[in-house]
Amino acid sequence: MNKLIEKLEKIYRIFPWPEDLSSPTVNKRLDEAYKVFKDLLDHSWLKDLLEERKNKDLIVIDICGGAGIGGIALAKALMDKGLGVKLIVNDLRITALGKARRYAKQILGIEIETLIEDALKLHEHNIRADLALIYGLTTPHFDPYQMVTLIASIAWILRPNGILLVEEHDRIYQIFYRIGYKQVLAEYAGEDRIALSIHAGYDPLTGVFKRILLDIPSMERVLTDVRFWDIAGTAAILWMFFKDVDFKPTRTQIRGILIAKKPRGINPRDYTMLPTIVKGSQQT
């Protein structure tokens, strides 16, 4: 796991993902997330869950949460409705989780729990949550087989009436139809530095694109696997592990929050061993 942690830290050093609360960009992200969740809480499934748990603290887990922007925004929307919240933020990046603790204290006035763990192994912990959240640029980190394991693990730690919220974006439509796949893409360009992502291959058996993230002028680089998920593909996997799935568009019809309710109780340990096809995967 140490190698994975080191790789993620390297990715987020090169990739310009804003996490500093003093930045206007991060404050804007936080405000936007709060508005999304405040509106989402009017969904009938969430109303039912909140009514059921109104006299008890809601256990909320923000998965792959980084600095906790999504989880903190959701917790604030819940607390503003008068609900008690216990927030857990999960990630592998220790530096990001330190920020999550500070930001939660500053914004929510509460101490939160942080969990340094591979999200595929959440079921190995003694957690029983009411609400789980995947927010931000998260799903592209997981290939289809990992996504199955991830959702199985999350469903396992939720209560029988628990709900999983997943922010998703139709990247098939946006990237391959609207924009066009780029061999070389400037992810960030400023006076001080440039961050490029460069096509380095495709694995047809895992469905991931290989891209090198390159920082200029330091020339630090890292090879990443990227899966371009769409709304329907993610929703179908959610449906495998939850009894019903809905979608609430946010900015556009191709971006929003997937809502999955009532876990089916499928044991994630059934997916411990990857299928033979993955072992034989190859790059083109």
Locate each region found by the language model.
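Conserved class I S-adenosyl-L-methionine
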Residues: 1-57
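Short amphipathic alpha-helix with an adjacent loop that forms part of the alpha/beta core around
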Residues: 121-127
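Class I SAM-dependent methyltransferase SAM/SAH-binding core
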Residues: 71-121
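SAM-dependent methyltransferase
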Residues: 167-235
